[in-house]
C-alpha cells in the first residue's frame, strides 16, 4: 500500500454549491452539496479525465447539507441523509422509492456488517431512538427492534451488537437484549471560540470496532471486540481525522490537507499523501467491487499514429482497469485511491533489469485469462506491451539474442527498433507503438552510445587496453547490427502483421526493406552482402521506386539491375549492364557482364529490345552473341531469317558461327559465301598469318616427295602449330572446304567472283579450297593441277585420281605429266606411281614423258611388271589354244558316241 496513488478528476461544472459527499455504485456517480442538491451522473466508462454524463439533479426539500449517500443494492436504491432527514431514492432516476416515508431527527444510518450486497436490514439512529429496520421491495418497512436511547452522537452495528457514543463515553449495546456495556470516556476538547468539540468516531473493522477520540493536534484509536475487550495496541494519529475507514490490512484517515495510511497489524504509518496548498479533503469512503480506468495505464497502452476502433479502445480500457480502495472528495476534485497498477510495477521491474519474473507473471495471465477475470484480448495486449518493453530493455543491456526473441513475438513496429540505429534511421520516419513504449524508447540512446554504456559497466572492459576496448566495441556493435538484420529479415519473410499496423503496412515494409538493404550494402563480406541484397530485391518489394532511388544514390548499379529485372524493365536492366561493361558505370559487385547479358536475353523480351542488345553483344563478344541466337532459335523464338535480317555485315563472324551450329541447310550457300569471303578478306588484317601460310606452303613444296603427307594431313598439323593466331581463320578454311563439297551446284557458281575476282591474289594460300572448287565444277585437270603443280601434293593428287578414275581415266596421264613438270624432286614418287599403277600407262608413253637426263633405273620396277604381265598374257594364250584343241577332240568323241547310241536304239525298235 506504500505505492497508493490518487487519481483525481475535476468536480463537474454543474455543481455550483460546495460538494459535501460523494458515492459511486453500479455505474452511477452521486454528488451531494451544501445546499441540499443531489446530482446523478452516468459513469459507465470509468474515465476519470472525461466529464461524466449528467443524468439528473434533484433539490431536497430540506435544503440542508447532504451528509451522506449510501447505496442499497438489494433495493436498487440509495439512502440520502441530509441535515437531520433522510429518504430512499431509486438509484437510476432519483425518484423516491417510499414517497410517503421520510426519516426525521436522523443521526446515523448504517448496515450491520461489512458486505451490503444482499442485506436489507439497517440500523437507524435518531435523536431519541435506536431502530433496527428492514426495507422490503414491496414498499413496506418493518421495524425489527426499537429502543429509546437519546443523545447518541454516532453508532455502528455488527450483527446485533451496536457500538455507540453518548455525550460522555463509548458503549456497547445488544440490540436484541438491550444489555449495555460501558467502555471508556471520550476526550472532550473545548476551543476558546464557541466551545467547538471534536466528535468521536467509530469504524467497523471486521468483527472489531475502532474507537477514535482526541484533540485537534492528535487522536487515539482503540480496537475492541463485541465484548468490549481491547484487541490491539493503541493507534495514534498526528491529527484529528475528518473521516476514517479500514480495509483488511490498512486504516485510512484524512485531515484537511493529508491522507495517512496505517498498517493495521503494526499500527505504523505506511504512507502519507499531502494535497496541494489550495486543496483540502472533505470526504473519504471505502469502495468495493468497483473498477476504474487508470488514465496513466490507458495512455501507455494507447497507440500513437493510428486511429483506434471501438474494439481496441474497449480492450485498452479494460486492460487499464484498476481496483480502487476508496473514493475521496476535495474542495476542487474527486477521485479514487488505488495501489499502483500491476502493469506499472512489472514495467518498473523490467526497466531496472529484472525481466524474467514479470514476463513469467504476464505469461500466466495470457495462458489462462479467465482465471484473472480478463479477456483474451486484454491478456494479449498486456503481454505484448511488456514484451516490447522487455525486448528494448534487453537490447539496452546488450542481450541481443533475448531481445530478438521478444521482438519477434511481441509484434512491435519494426520502425521502433530501426530508430535505434541512426545510420539507418531518418528523421521523417514515424512509427505506430504504445505510448509507453515510445516514452521508454526515448530514454534509450543510439546504438553507439548504448554499446559504450554497456561495456563501461563491464569490469573486464575497464581493465583492458585501448586497442582491445576498441575491438570489443566493434564486436558488440557488429552483434547489434547482426541482431537487427536477423530480425528484419525474419519480419520480411513473415506474412502476418499486427492488426494495429495494417493501416500502415506499406510504410512499415518500406522501412524494413530500406533498412535491410542498407545493412546488406554495408556488410564487409561483399559476396554475402550482394547475395542477401539480391534475395531481398527478388523477394518482392513494397516500394520499388524508393529502393530504386536508394540504389541510384548509392551507385549500386548491379543491384539496381536486379531490381529492374523484378519489374520486367528489360531495357533498364540491359542498359545498366551495358554501361557497366563499357565503363560508364562502375560497380565492384558486377562481373561476367557479357555472360549476364547473354543469359538475360534468352528470356521473353520485346523484339526491339532483344535485337538492340543482341546485335550489341555480337559486336562485343561473338561467342556469347552466337549462343543467344542459337538458344532463341532452339526455343522457337526466332528463325534464321530473323538473324539474317538483323545482323549486319560487320557481324559475319557471328552469322557464320550461328549458321554452322544451327545446321541451317537452306542457308549453306550463304554460309559458304561468308566463310570464303571472310577467309580471304581477313588476310589484310592478319599479315603474320598470311606469311605463316606462305612459309608453310613453301615448306611443304620443299619436303622430300616420299616423306611428305598429303597436304590435307599437313594442314591439320599446321593449325595446331598456329594456335597463336585467330582460330576463326582455320575454322573458315575448313568450313569452306566442307561446304564446297556439299552445297548445290548453283551455289558453287555464286562464289566464283569471290574466288577469282575479288580475292584472287590470296587464293593461292588456300589450295584445298581452290581444288574443291574445281573438283565440284568437274574441271578435273584444274583440280589436279592445284594439288600437284601448285603445291607439289603428289600423294594428294594420286588420291584424287583414285576418286575420278571411273569418270576421267586420263587423270593418271595428267598426274604423271604434272608431277614430271614439278621437277626432278618427284622422281621417287613417279617410280612408286608407275609401280602402283603400271597398267595405267604404256611403255612408249612413259618413255616419251620421262626426261632424258633421268636415270632409267626408276623404270626397272615398271618394266618388270610389264614383262611379267606380257609373260602372263603369252602363257594364257598358249594354254587357251591347248584347251581349245582338247575340247574340240572331246566334243568330237562325244558326238560319235551319241550317234552310236542312236543307231543301237533304232534297231531295237524295229
Curated annotation (Swiss-Prot):
TPR repeats: 69-101, 383-416, 554-587, 674-710, 712-743, 763-797
Gene Ontology CC: CORVET complex; cytoplasm; cytosol; membrane; nucleus
Pfam families: CNH
Keywords: Cytoplasm, Protein transport, Repeat, TPR repeat, Transport
Compartment annotation: Cytoplasm
Family from the record: Belongs to the VPS3 family.
Function: Required for sorting and processing of soluble vacuolar proteins.
Matching PANTHER family: CNH DOMAIN CONTAINING (PTHR12894), TRANSFORMING GROWTH FACTOR-BETA RECEPTOR-ASSOCIATED PROTEIN 1 (PTHR12894:SF27)
Protein name: Vacuolar protein sorting-associated protein 3
